[in-house]
Design a protein with these regions (language model features):
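Short, acidic, Ser/Thr-enriched surface-loop or helix-capping motifs
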Residues: 227
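Short acidic, Pro/Gly- and aromatic-enriched capping/linker segments at domain boundaries
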Residues: 219-224
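Cleft-lining beta-strand/loop regions that shape enzyme active-site pockets
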Residues: 6-7, 15-17, 29-32, 37-203, ...
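Conserved functional hotspot residues or short segments at active or partner-binding sites
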Residues: 233, 249-267
Length: 267
């Protein structure tokens, strides 16, 4: 397992420190990390303090000092594409993601969107409860994800509504992980919409990180996520229905498919 940078957001400490897409985080303050959950828990800290990262970039390994700061990043951006297709870029599952996604969807419909492209590329996950709430907007009544625990019964999460009433296309890539894969997996298995892009990251384990008195960190796997059809995500990822490489080409294909679905709706 490794912690790979998807794409540093503009204005964040990661970008300002010089981190690049594809960089691998080996250690945080000397502590070896092999999961994004553990890395994130070690990287977080008070603003204006320093955290040391050991980075592998290609064949090179080097140390990088990052200055922490308070940042506010919108979870969602949205706009119209090619006249009548609404694009919702869901960048993370934070505490505001459901509200922002719902507002974006309503705004795009008001502006005349006849189809939606949901962009989950570079979304590394976040709060699963927000993912499940967002699934209500897109996935009709039925299973979203099953969570398999080591020492307790399997838990199945459902949607209860009617889902989206206009065509949907979903963008994914290798930066789509964890909660993004839960949502994309439900959309794919339930045949709500095609996935366009490249294979997703393959993070299907929900993990907790606990710091001990001596400062060491213990990583505990809490559960494993399975798609509605019982597919394991971890270590495998989701294969897109339409394989396309390159950010711009992926978006163009998604918009093309969305517009085609408007012209030729499936009954």
């Amino acid at each position: 397992d490794q912690v790979k940078i998807a794409r540093p957001m503009k204005g964040t400490p990661a970008e300002e420190a010089g981190l690049k897409e594809g960089d691998v985080i080996l250690r945080v303050d000397g502590e070896t990390v092999r999961s994004s959950d553990v890395a994130a828990s070690l990287i977080r800290g008070p603003a204006d303090t320093q955290v040391s990262l050991t980075i592998r970039r290609g064949q090179d390994t080097f140390e990088l000092s990052v200055t922490r700061k308070s940042i506010s990043i919108p979870a969602v951006e949205h706009r119209m594409e090619d006249g009548d297709v609404g694009l919702i870029a869901l960048m993370s599952f934070n505490e505001h993601s459901f509200q922002e996604t719902s507002e974006a969807l309503n705004d795009l419909k008001t502006r005349g969107a006849k189809a939606i492209v949901l962009d989950l590329r570079y979304n590394g996950g976040g709060y699963v409860d927000q993912c499940l709430a967002i699934a209500e907007l897109f996935v009709p009544k039925g299973t979203v994800v099953s969570q398999r625990f080591k020492s307790s019964p399997e838990k199945v999460n459902y949607t209860s509504g009617e889902g989206l009433d206009i065509p949907l296309v979903v963008l994914v890539n290798g930066g789509s992980a964890s909660a993004s894969e839960i949502l994309a997996g439900a959309i794919q298995d339930r045949e709500v919409a095609p996935l366009v892009g490249t294979t997703t990251f393959g993070k299907g384990l929900v993990q907790g990180a606990y710091t001990l008195d001596d400062g060491s960190v213990v990583k505990v796997t809490v559960s494993e996520s399975l798609t509605p059809n019982g597919r394991a995500i971890n270590g495998v990822g989701l294969e897109p229905d339409v394989f396309v490489e390159g950010d711009e080409a992926q978006l163009a294909k998604a918009v093309e498919l969305a517009k085609a679905a408007v012209l030729n709706p499936v009954s």
